[in-house]
Amino acid sequence: MPLVVFCGLPYSGKSRRVEELRAALEAEGRAVQVVDDAAVLGAEDATVYGDSAREKALRGALRAAVERLLSRQDVVILDSLNYIKGFRYELYCLARAARTPICLVYCVRPGSLSGGLRVAGAVDNPNRNVSVSWRPRAEEGGRPLAVGTDVLGEPQAVASLVNRRAQAEVPTESEPKEIRAADLPALVASESEKSAEHASGAFYPPELLEALALRFEAPDSRNRWDRPLFTLVGLEEPLPLAEIRAALFENRAPPPHQSTQSQPLASGSFLHQLDQVTSQVLAGLMEAQKSAVPGDLLKLPGTTEHLRFTRPLTMAELSRLRRQFISYTKMHTNNENLPQLANMFLQYLSQSLH
């Protein structure tokens, strides 16, 4: 069944959108399987994205989990950052090999993020690469400033954690001012009510959010592995269930090509004869070269053509060429070539040895 890939930075509402889509599909009686970081790691851990080796292992585990679940019965939803276009292409190839449709849902949060990180331009053009700006908090007297303190009259982001995610408000006063912890929920209550996200067990530090935003490769509908593409800006925009449903269940699956389609298996008799004929040719060649001198034409068993002898040949070299010939012939089986197998192998040896 189809594969739905969710893409976006942390705190963009991906998990909430996944729950919406899963609930809608299950209400229609469809079986839905969700693959996310927590399912693979055992618990959601944001520090994975700060270590390239661990992140690479995570992508491999996510890809393997998706490949195991792809079937004709269940809808598979991948809930992860999926910010690398090369990884999205690998997922596209998995769906193509399974002959099942695929679509991409890109979640963008237009507002501010934790620690002062802001994504600009997402509202104007959600399909382009977003720009990122972030400024760490300054220190005064060797100690970090309190949350919400202004520096030299410049507004400083006030971060708070509401429902285990970060929100931000920018005070308008130019005077340094302390914001009490008791007042923080009131500053962001209205925003949190509008954009409450699915609870996440991971907290992304500002430095990690900035790094993820800088290396984020936004989806582009011009790429075949990024379409059909559905871009959702903010949590207020409704999920396009009708369009997603049409992309998953009404569109044709991408056709397989040579890299994703299994090669036809050769019959047992063909493989047996191929192995037998090539072995006889090698045995005859090793025996004939014992009394041959360079320039002689060697007549080998089962062949009507001759092989010009130029130098002594080792069994290791001939065995390597035999394996290459067998691998190529198995992918291009043709029963009409059975009588010519010995001559074909002799021609292959003649071209490879000179």
From Swiss-Prot:
Positions with a binding annotation for ATP: 8-15
Gene3D superfamilies linked: P-loop containing nucleotide triphosphate hydrolases (3.40.50.300)
SUPFAM superfamilies assigned to the protein according to its UniProt record, in alphabetical order: P-loop containing nucleoside triphosphate hydrolases
GO BP, sorted A to Z: tRNA wobble uridine modification
Entries under Pfam families matching the protein: KTI12
Organism: Bos taurus
GO molecular function: ATP binding
Family, as annotated: Belongs to the KTI12 family.
Coiled coil segments of this chain: none
Top-level division of the source organism's lineage: Eukaryota
Lineage summary: Eukaryota, Metazoa, Chordata, Craniata, Vertebrata
The keyword Phosphoprotein is assigned to this record: yes
InterPro entries assigned to the protein according to its UniProt record, in alphabetical order: KTI12/PSTK, P-loop_NTPase
Keywords: ATP-binding, Nucleotide-binding, Phosphoprotein
Transmembrane feature ranges: none
Residues modified as Phosphoserine: 200
Protein name from the UniProt record: Protein KTI12 homolog
Keyword NAD applies: no
